[in-house]
Amino acid sequence: MPKMVRHDFSSALGQITTARYWQCVKENKIHMTQTDSGWAKFAWGKIYGQWICGAAVGAYDTEKFHPIDMIEAMERIRPSTFCAPATIYRFLIKEDLSKYDFSYIEHACLAGEPLNPEVFHQIEKLTGMRIYEGFGQSESSVLLANYPWVEIKPGSMGKPAPGYDIALLDENGEECEDGMVGSICIRVDQGHPTGLFRDYWKDDAAMEKSFKFGYYNTGDTAWRDGDGYYWFVGRNDDVIKCSGYRIGP
């Protein structure tokens, strides 16, 4: 069943890492994250860290998503930074983008679901945008991401975000070697990371399941390559997401 995630007021400060280091928002410029208001990324992807860093926020909202309508809205708003789920990028490559100029976008990123490398390369070819993929949760700020100071590996979640001590653990709490699949876990026994939630409200069973061995277990699995990049595998629970939407439970 869905869980209520309780944050304290310091969580908004954790989103500075999201905005400044991953999304690369700039003071007095416009950032645009394309997401629905029912998704946690609406808050951590376009409001908290972005406003703290001094950026204005551009928005495109409609009952039904149309790629060309969004592009035309972006041409009016002219955001310097842009973020969207993978499905939107997949929609974009199906359109004739030759008549549009995307040069005003200085930095583009993605979260919500993995992006296949073929779409990454096609977006770069058609628009000039290189997409910096990241991974976060309702429970946190961005946890893993591709950053401007490291080489992008298309399809990878990237590397740990500043402020988080992240490990891949097996079911016994032992660290996984490179190439092995494990649960993405955040160390909490040496201090509570700014940006991480405090608890699942009135849900002791969820807390007991998620906090073990001195770590918070995200419920997501991945493997790590020899260069320290993480690659998404799946969920440990029954959460189903498609096109950035939570379908079940």
Language-model segments: which ranges?
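Gly/Ser/Thr-rich phosphate-binding loop
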Residues: 52, 79-83, 93-153, 165
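Conserved ATP-binding/catalytic segment of the ANL
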Residues: 177, 185-249
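Short beta-strand-to-turn element immediately C-terminal to the catalytic PLP-Schiff-base lysine
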Residues: 6-8, 144-148, 169-170, 186-187
